[in-house]
């Protein structure tokens, strides 16, 4: 009897605790309502626009501002930096049955097409353009010449096509038109000019160039990713065959220069055209030629090029952002996406083989030819750091866990699994098993609260249906709520000044809820996209801090201000 009473009491306590803790869908619902209320348009009386601020102080409701060098303030509303939120709004409607959230996302898309699409099709968004929510006027840092730029943004084209197919197609054509400087040789650039007349586009002639040919435009993969993704979606939704031809052609440009022995690379398929001379190693303008060759060439020879630098940050673009995007396209495009899957999984296997240190869960900094740069001391100033800087191995974090887990669901390869398993173990998730479902011993007491880990576990669960992975995902989800849900917003640290409305914690929680309900299609696949704003920012002393990024403002705690970055 006593045992029964204790059991009953324990059950009642658990029931009360459960009742006192809102479920994850309720939490996301509360969060989204807070975003729509506090980050909304408070400036236009009875006729507010549907637009949103990028950031908000959860405690006061103050919306995050950009301060221009001339002292003007603007409430930052950059639609390219709200694309995860758009996916959250649609997913929340799908799971809750409340259509108002999806309708708000649709209204935001429609408003941008109506008010901020130029004659060439480009939108006012991206790294150097945004809308001031107070005035509704387009803004941008003047020193960047107000150019168009997307880097790993991955706009929610599925939503955009559903709202206005023609306007979305116009944007994608205009995007390629502005960023491909020379179609014949595939010279691309991260910067595109607004208002350009549309050229031949997909009908343009093309001649394959040798790896790392010299161009003025810089073929950074983070910019190429968005071009590849957009043209592929244009093919998917508008059946423009030429768009897919050019999307795959561009993707292949980053594959052809891979090192023939290792299969590693590349971050760029061109090198900067040398147009001027300098004796100042600290001046890293691309007009002086390839910046890796300037800094590493005397010691490592002609293969030391920017495209071959397998360093922290660059490898995230190649083996996380690009990998997730192309793996998804490969699935979506069926037979037409087979090459994308092969290129991506081949690259991930090469990176696993040559770069991953399982003993301490790090990646080696390398040249694409396999030269290990671990603990290398820079002999001169340059693009990759000041003289004396030591290049160190860097942690294999949960974003890499996600790309390797997702790749394994496409290609069950032992090398891919080895890396996913090793990262999971190092990230406190326990033992994923010698294979999915075999020798599994996950840690259901984990303190891991990383949404990337949650997404990775959901990928493994969807592919294997091993319940342990879903249980572990639920634990990570609980940790996210208990540690990152602060004052009605999600923040990595509770003392941050501003909450980012595009943060991915609610996205991960919605994906978890969808998996638990066996409705994974209700939430858009996670691609690890994110927009940004960058430019000159006025400091408190009146000086201009060049190349300031919005994420630096999001990292400030209450009472902190930006410190000089000493960039020129």
Curated annotation (Swiss-Prot):
* Compartments, as annotated in UniProt: Periplasm
Q: Can you tell which superkingdom this protein's organism belongs to?
A: Bacteria
Which cysteine residues pair off into disulfide bonds? Answer: none
InterPro entries recorded: Pectate_lyase_2
Q: What is its EC number?
A: 4.2.2.2
Q: Name one GO cellular component term.
A: periplasmic space
- Describe the reaction catalysed, as an equation: Eliminative cleavage of (1->4)-alpha-D-galacturonan to give oligosaccharides with 4-deoxy-alpha-D-galact-4-enuronosyl groups at their non-reducing ends
Keywords, sorted A to Z = Lyase, Periplasm, Signal
Indicate the enzyme's highest-level EC class.
Answer: lyase
- GO process terms (BP): pectin catabolic process
Q: In which pathway does it act?
A: Glycan metabolism; pectin degradation; 2-dehydro-3-deoxy-D-gluconate from pectin: step 2/5
Q: Cite the GO molecular-function annotations of the record.
A: pectate lyase activity
According to its UniProt record, where is this protein mainly located?
periplasm
Instruction: Kindly indicate whether the keyword Lyase belongs to this entry.
Output: yes
> What residue stretch is flagged as signal peptide?
1-19
Similarity annotation:
Belongs to the polysaccharide lyase 2 family.
What protein am I looking at? Periplasmic pectate lyase
Q: Which organism is it from?
A: Pectobacterium carotovorum subsp. carotovorum
Q: Which gene encodes it?
A: pelB
């Amino acid at each position: 009897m006593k045992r029964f009473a204790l059991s009953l009491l324990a059950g009642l306590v658990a029931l009360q605790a459960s009742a006192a803790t809102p479920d994850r869908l309720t939490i996301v619902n509360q969060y989204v309502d807070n975003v729509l209320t506090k980050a909304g348009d408070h400036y236009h009386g009875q006729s507010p626009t549907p637009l949103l601020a990028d950031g908000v102080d959860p405690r006061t409701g103050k919306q995050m501002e950009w301060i221009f060098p001339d002292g003007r303030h603007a409430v930052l509303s950059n639609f390219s930096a709200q694309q995860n939120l758009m996916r959250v709004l649609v997913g929340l409607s799908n799971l809750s049955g409340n259509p108002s959230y999806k309708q708000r996302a649709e209204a935001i898309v429609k408003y941008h097409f109506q008010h901020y699409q130029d004659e060439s099709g480009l939108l006012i968004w991206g790294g150097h353009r945004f809308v001031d929510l107070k005035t509704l006027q387009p803004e941008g840092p003047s020193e960047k010449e107000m150019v168009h730029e997307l880097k790993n943004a991955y706009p929610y084209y599925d939503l955009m096509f559903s709202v206005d197919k023609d306007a979305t197609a116009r944007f994608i054509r205009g995007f390629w038109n502005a960023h491909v400087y020379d179609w014949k040789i595939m010279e691309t650039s991260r910067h595109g000019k607004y208002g350009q007349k549309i050229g031949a586009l997909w009908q343009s002639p093309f001649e394959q160039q040798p790896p790392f040919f010299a161009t003025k435009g810089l073929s950074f993969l983070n910019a190429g990713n968005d071009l590849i993704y957009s043209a592929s979606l244009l093919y998917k939704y508008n059946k423009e065959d030429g768009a897919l031809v050019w999307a795959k052609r561009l993707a292949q440009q980053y594959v052809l220069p891979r090192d023939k022995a290792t299969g590693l690379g590349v971050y760029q398929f061109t090198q900067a055209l040398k147009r001027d001379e300098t004796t100042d190693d600290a001046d890293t303008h691309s007009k002086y030629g390839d910046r890796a060759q300037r800094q590493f060439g005397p010691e490592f020879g002609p293969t030391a090029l920017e495209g071959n630098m397998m360093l922290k940050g660059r490898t995230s673009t190649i083996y996380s952002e690009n990998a997730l995007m192309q793996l998804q396209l490969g699935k979506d495009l069926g037979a037409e996406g087979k090459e994308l899957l092969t290129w991506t999984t081949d690259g991930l296997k090469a990176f696993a083989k040559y770069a991953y240190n399982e003993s301490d869960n790090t990646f080696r900094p390398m040249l694409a030819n396999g030269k290990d740069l671990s603990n290398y001391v820079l002999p001169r100033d340059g693009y990759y750091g000041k003289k004396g800087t030591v290049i160190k191995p860097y942690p294999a974090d949960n974003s890499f866990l996600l790309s390797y887990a997702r790749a394994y669901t496409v290609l069950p390869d032992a090398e891919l699994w080895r890396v996913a398993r090793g990262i999971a173990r190092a990230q406190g998730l326990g033992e994923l098993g010698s294979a999915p479902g075999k020798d599994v011993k996950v840690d259901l007491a984990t303190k891991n609260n990383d949404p990337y880990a949650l997404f990775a576990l959901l990928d493994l669960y969807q592919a294997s249906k091993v319940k342990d992975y879903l249980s572990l995902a639920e634990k990570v989800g609980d940790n996210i709520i208990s540690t990152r849900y602060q004052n009605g917003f999600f923040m990595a640290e509770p003392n941050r000044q501003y909450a980012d409305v595009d943060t991915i914690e609610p996205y991960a929680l919605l994906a978890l809820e969808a998996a638990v309900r066996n409705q994974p299609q209700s939430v858009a696949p996670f691609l690890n996209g994110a927009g940004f704003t960058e430019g000159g920012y006025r400091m408190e002393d009146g000086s201009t801090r060049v190349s300031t990024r919005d994420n630096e403002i999001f990292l400030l705690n209450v009472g902190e201000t930006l410190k000089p970055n000493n960039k020129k």
